[in-house]
Amino acid sequence: MIKVENLYKGFDGVPVLKNINVEYETGKCNMIIGASGSGKTVLLKNLIGLMTPDSGEISYGDMKMSQMTDKEKKLLRQKIGIIFKGSALFDFATVIENVMFPMEFFTDWSPAQRRERAQFCLEKVNVIGSDKKFPNELSGGMQKRVGIARAIALNPEYLFCDEPNSGLDPYTSILID
C-alpha cells in the first residue's frame, strides 16, 4: 500500500499540493484525475521520489520515504516502473539500450539476459525491428511505446503512468490499457 499523509509541495511560495491525504492499495488500478495544471504530475513525481515534499509523508508499506536510506530507496526504485508524458528516452542510446538502461542499475542480470528481456518488452508493445534505431528515427507514438517497454522491463510492483495514452493511436491505447 502507498499512503500519502498531509502532503504539501509548493514552488516560489505558491502551493501546488496542499494537505493531500490518500491511500493506494497494492494490486489496484488508481487514477489521479484533474484539470491541466492541477498538480497531478507534481504528485506523481513526489510519489516516485523525483521530488521531495515540503512537508507530509509518503509511505510504501511500513517504510516512510523520508526515513529511507539510499540503499532502501534503491530497492524501492527497483519496484517502480514509470511511463512519462513524453517518451523520456535518451537520444544518445539505441532503442534496445534505452529499454536495457534500468536493468543495468537495478539487476545483476548478464548483458545477454538484459538484452533478451528488453527484446521481450519491445515485442509486448509491438516495437519489432527497431532495436538498433535511435529515438529521433522513430515516430512520437513509437517513442512512447519504447518508453512503455522500459517501464515494464523490471516487471515492477508499482507502475506509475503520467498520461500513458498520449501520443498513441486508438488501437495501441486499448492494447496498453
PLM region spans:
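Helix-to-loop junction immediately C-terminal to a conserved catalytic motif
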Residues: 48
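Conserved ABC transporter NBD signature motif
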Residues: 56-64
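A short, proline-enriched helix->beta-strand linker immediately N-terminal to the Walker B motif
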Residues: 153-157
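Conserved ABC ATPase signature
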Residues: 134-138, 142
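Conserved ABC ATPase "signature" region
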Residues: 63-64, 111-130
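Helix N-cap at the start of a conserved alpha-helix in ABC-type nucleotide-binding domains
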Residues: 170-172
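Catalytic Walker B motif of ABC-type/P-loop ATPase nucleotide-binding domains
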Residues: 159-162
